[in-house]
Amino acid sequence: MASISQTNQFPCKTLSQNPPHNQFTSKPSILPLNSVRISRSLAKKSFLSIQGFTRARPLVLTRAADDDEWGPEKEKEGGGALAVAEEESPKEVTEIDNLKKALVDSFYGTDRGLNATSETRAEIVELITQLEAKNPTPAPTEALTLLNAKWILVYTSFSGLFPLLSRGTLPLARVEEISQTIDSENFTVQNSIQFAGPLATTSISTNAKFEVRSPKRVQIKFEEGVIGTPQVTDSLVLPENVEFLGQKIDLSPFKGILSSVQDTASSVAKTISSQPPLKFSISNSNAQSWLLTTYLDEDLRISRADAGSVFVFIKEGSPLLMP
């Protein structure tokens, strides 16, 4: 709506009286009287007051131009923009969001729990307990669509995994990823560990079936083990030079030798990678366990095993996995 000071800029038309005559006369205005919403009584009163004077005060009728940039149309557009801004307001951060962030931050430097100090473990246990008390999915086995995903292990207190996580167990190899893939339609679980070395990567996994035993608990029976086919690196990158005892050694003469070695390595890599994975059955009747899901939402899962060990998983692709 235009301010009073801005009305001086609006196009106006002046109705003035002819001095020689006492009777009120005016030229036809480009703006009809009713276009500025002046009532008949007001117009009549103005006319009578003018008749009593030889020189009447001019009656000024104003009307805002149609192209007023502050007019109703602009206000309408502004209101729409405000509505859009309200719809795009950021999601409110809840107490659960803060607990999840604090829990994930506490995993930093622990190598999935292997290097966690007693103080850090106590902090993690406290955060897990608080999250379990606020579990948004009290019956996880009745929400199988949430369970149906690939879950990345980010922390565990299961000591049986620590020798595997230790670098001394497998020289020149490191654990790249530990995951659990749940297929709720076929009631299957696949536990997988991926290893990475300087020249190859491989994986070891177990396939199992699960049965729902309670709103939080499932029984798992392992059926098959799989050793993945090693994916051999078929290319080696040789630097231009290396520094040894304070001197730079030029390695360009060795590039010709490396090229012939790479051709052989590429052929070997293709041969090995084309082989099928090695599978073996698990027929031991004791190869089973149960799993209790104590917290579950769209990107975080906390489970406890039969020995009381805790496992914290984050769904693959979740923003929580980003550093």
UniProtKB/Swiss-Prot annotation:
GO terms for cellular component: chloroplast. Its main location: plastid. It is found in: Plastid, Chloroplast. Residues 1-63 form a transit peptide. Pfam families: PAP_fibrillin (PF04755). Disulfide bonds: none annotated. InterPro entries: PAP, PAP/fibrillin_dom. Constitutively expressed in flowers, leaves, and fruits. Residues 1-28, 66-88 are annotated as: Disordered. Keywords: Chloroplast, Plastid, Transit peptide. Belongs to the PAP/fibrillin family. This is Plastid-lipid-associated protein, chloroplastic.
